[in-house]
A protein has these predicted regions:
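C-terminal or mid-to-C-terminal helical accessory/interaction module adjacent to the motor/catalytic core
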Residues: 337-338
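Inter-lobe coupling/hinge segments of SF2-like helicase ATPases
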Residues: 2-334
Length: 338
């Protein structure tokens, strides 16, 4: 925070990368920088790669700023036309203080009266040209803060983001424990299921994530529908309740399942990467990632960040078919070391 405050108060244009694991407090830092910007008479915007993440930021920041006389709006692909027009007009006349959104912020029609701060979350999900487009929304370039949960070695950060200063949040919030990361093969599935059963008996909850919704002839990966059947056989009603969440579900059904899990009404959530962001369940202590070789490092980090949000000992289990490729070995090592 001191580094960023110094940048903002220096009279020069800030260009900074903020790196910190999921749940380390990046949103809080972003909020404080926004308040500095607003206090000096500027508007601020925050761009996220998905509607779920943008909505999560909007909900969090709205709660935090509820007692302040500030106007916060959200603009995404699903924003209705009338609301969209109102937001466009309010941005230009300066009555919106903070705008949160997705790629919708990049549209030509989105113009600000006095943009002083641009924040980009999960910046690696956006191209350089896209980020630059956001920064050109003002006559004078705004201060820029880009955030990532994926650990980037400092030498690599200098290579890819040489124009950015780097700040690292290397501490977890008080009471938060580091998530243990292990890998297991399909041959150990019975032991993994037994571990899940033991955790549920202790009062914990479990995520099981799949790369695909349905079986594919082209891709030899575990799929969610098949997995859901085998999990409900192994963990049957009435002793166990299992939620299922994927991208083809209607938003209301998805929200219902997510809320049931968040309230502790179900013990297991079987899902695709839609739960990569936007789900905060402190009681969840186990994350099982099926066909882990299918996921990139940033996705694995985000998924692992869904557990370990309370004070329980938590574990992330990466499931593989059999032999590990060199790439898989490298990813596991990076995850275990971070």
């Amino acid at each position: 925070i001191k580094e960023i405050r110094k940048d903002v108060g220096s009279g020069f244009h800030m260009n900074r990368l903020l790196q910190g694991d999921v749940g380390s407090g990046k949103t809080l830092v972003a909020l404080l920088v926004m308040l500095i910007s607003i206090d000096n008479g500027f508007q601020a915007c925050l761009m996220a790669p998905t509607e779920i993440l943008a909505t999560q930021h909007y909900t969090t920041l709205s709660k935090m700023l509820s007692k302040m006389n500030l106007r916060i709006e959200i603009l995404t692909g699903s924003t209705k036309k009338a609301k969209r027009t109102d937001i466009h007009e309010s941005l230009i006349n300066g009555t919106i203080d903070v705008l949160i959104g997705t790629h919708a912020l990049l549209e030509e029609v989105v113009q600000f009266k006095n943009l002083g701060l641009s924040i980009v979350d999960e910046q690696h999900r956006f191209g350089v040209a896209q980020r630059a487009k956001l920064w050109k929304k003002n006559t004078n370039p705004p201060h820029v803060l880009v955030m990532t949960a994926t650990p980037i070695p400092r030498t690599l950060a200098m290579t890819f983001y040489g124009d950015l200063d780097v700040s690292v949040i290397d501490e977890l919030p008080p009471g938060r424990k580091k998530v243990k990361t292990v890998h297991r093969f399909d041959s150990s599935r019975l032991q993994v299921f037994q571990f899940i059963e033991d955790e549920i008996k202790k009062g914990g909850q479990v995520y099981i994530v799949y790369p695909l919704i349905e079986e594919s002839e082209k891709l030899d990966y575990k799929d969610l529908m098949d997995g859901y059947e085998s999990i409900t056989r192994r963990f049957p009603l009435p002793d166990y309740k299992v939620s299922i969440v994927h991208g083809k579900m209607k938003p209301e059904a998805k929200d219902y399942e997510m809320n049931a899990f968040a309230k502790g009404q179900t013990q297991i959530m079987v899902a695709t990467t839609v739960i990569e962001v936007g789900v905060d369940v402190p009681n969840a202590s186990v994350m099982v990632i099926e066909s882990a070789e299918k996921f990139g490092l940033s996705q694995l980090h985000q998924l692992r960040g869904r557990v370990g949000r309370g004070n329980k000992d938590s574990v992330c289990i990466l499931m593989f078919k059999s032999n590990l490729s060199d790439n898989a070995k490298k990813r596991i090592k990076i995850l275990k070391d971070s």
